[in-house]
Amino acid sequence: MKKKTVLVTGATSGIGEGCARRFAEGGYDVIITGRNEERLARLKTELEKQGSEVITLTFDVRDRKAAEEALKSLPTDWKFIDVLINNAGLARGLDPEYLGNFDDWDQMIDTNIKGLLTMTRLIVPSMVAHNHGHIINIGSVAGDAAYAGGNVYCATKAAVKAITDGLRIDVADTRLRVTNIKPGLVETNFSNIRFHGDTQRADNVYKGITPLRGSDIADVAFYAASAPEHVQIAEVLVLATHQANGTVIHRGK
């Protein structure tokens, strides 16, 4: 009997990599997707050494055609996905809205919103047909309230909340479950990407506080997926201990 299958987008680092590891540890077959083929191959090797079956799909969620072709390439017994983790996402820049970079905006909107919608649209119909499945979207505390310079990124994560809530309504007459996990400060390469490789500026984001790790969010995702079928963990806000919300953080010396 085939094990359950999870598909994780943006699995080459951070929360996505953590989810791939946690679900593999929990007995799932794992489909990992991302843009970096070398990193995917490395993770696949590590997970297979632990006894997991793993398939890698290299594509950018912004490329709808590539996503469709990648999913079509899956072997027959891998085509039904029990858990979809829409993790791929990023922040770019921290400029005032009136000085924002158009390319940064496009990348955030196309990845965080349209990429998530693409994967949902391609995978969820099969879940509905089987009357079984779980969609876990990785949102953010940033979707609850805007912060200085966060304008468009915050808007994309507010959209993730609305999209997640809307999907939950759409599948309420099925046995599907839909979860929005909203992390606070997580130490990944997120800030390095936001600041276009400025590592010093990125490191300052985590200065004076013990941030969350990707594995912490992965544990929450696995908990939600492991709940009894009649239990739907609809939304979870996960913050570092010294973080009160999206903007209030106590930093030690």
Model-derived features with residue positions:
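The beta1-alpha1 cofactor-binding region of Rossmann-like NAD(H)/NADP(H)-dependent oxidoreductases
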Residues: 37-38, 58-69, 102
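Residue(s) in the substrate-gating loop at a strand-loop-helix junction
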Residues: 140
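Substrate-binding pocket helix/loop in short-chain dehydrogenase/reductase
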Residues: 95-97, 101-109
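Conserved glycine-rich cofactor-binding loop
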Residues: 12-14
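Active-site helix of classical SDR
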Residues: 120, 156
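Alpha-helical segment proximal to the catalytic Tyr-Lys
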Residues: 125, 169-172
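C-terminal helical subdomain
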Residues: 180-184, 188, 200-247
